[in-house]
C-alpha cells in the first residue's frame, strides 16, 4: 500500500466507495485515493463520511493508488510528525508539540484523535510522559500494535 501523504483537501461532495481492506473500514475515491481508514463499524464510518459532505456511492472498491489525509493545518503538522516516528519507537505528546511549535500536549492529543488513517499515520506511537496516554481505538489495541512493532511483526 502506498505511504500516506498528509495534505489538506476539501471533502465536500467527494464521491467515495466504502468497503473493508485488511480488517479496516475504508473510503476510496473513484480515482483510487484512500481518504479514510479506521478500525470501526460501517454505520459509524458512513455517518462520519456524510458529516464531512462525502457522497457514498455503491460499487466495488477501486484499486488504491494514493493515500491522502484531510485535516486542519495544525492536524496535518501533527500527523506528519507522527509519520517520522519509526516502527517500534514512541514519542511523547509533549515532544510532538515541541516539534510542531505548539505549547500544548493536549492539543496534540486532540489532533491525533482526529487521525483518519489509523496505522498509516501511526498515532499509536505517541504516548503520555507518564504512560500510554489515550487512543481513539482503545488502549488494548494501542498496546498490541506497539508490541507487534517491537516484536518485528508489523511495520
Regions found by a protein language model. Name each.
Residues 119-128:
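Short Lys/Arg-enriched helix C-cap and helix-to-coil transition segments
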Residues 1-103, 152-155:
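Basic nucleic-acid-binding alpha-helical/helix-turn surface characteristic of O6-alkylguanine DNA
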Residues 12, 68, 75, 127, ...:
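Generic, ordered loop/turn and secondary-structure boundary motif
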Residues 111-120:
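Major-groove DNA-recognition helix of helix-turn-helix-type DNA-binding domains
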Residues 130-155:
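…primarily DNA-binding HTH/wHTH and HhH modules…
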Residues 107-108:
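Helix-turn-helix DNA-binding helix
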Residues 82, 96, 123-124, 145:
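Residue-level signal for inorganic ion chemistry
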Amino acid at each position: 500500500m502506498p505511504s500516506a501523504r498528509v495534505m489538506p483537501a476539501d471533502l465536500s461532495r467527494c464521491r467515495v466507495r466504502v468497503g473493508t481492506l485488511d480488517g479496516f473500514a475504508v473510503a476510496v475515491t473513484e480515482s483510487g485515493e484512500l481518504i479514510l481508514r479506521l478500525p470501526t463499524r460501517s454505520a459509524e464510518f458512513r455517518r462520519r463520511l456524510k458529516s464531512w459532505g462525502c457522497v457514498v456511492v455503491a460499487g466495488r472498491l477501486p484499486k488504491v493508488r494514493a493515500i491522502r489525509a484531510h485535516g486542519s493545518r495544525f492536524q496535518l503538522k501533527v500527523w506528519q510528525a507522527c509519520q517520522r516516528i519509526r516502527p517500534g519507537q514512541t514519542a511523547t505528546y509533549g515532544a510532538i508539540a515541541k516539534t510542531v511549535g505548539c505549547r500544548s500536549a493536549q492539543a496534540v492529543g486532540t489532533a491525533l484523535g482526529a487521525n483518519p488513517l489509523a496505522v498509516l499515520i501511526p498515532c499509536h506511537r505517541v504516548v503520555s510522559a507518564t504512560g500510554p496516554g489515550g487512543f481513539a481505538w482503545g488502549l488494548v489495541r494501542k498496546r498490541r500494535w506497539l508490541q507487534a512493532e517491537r516484536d518485528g511483526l508489523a511495520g
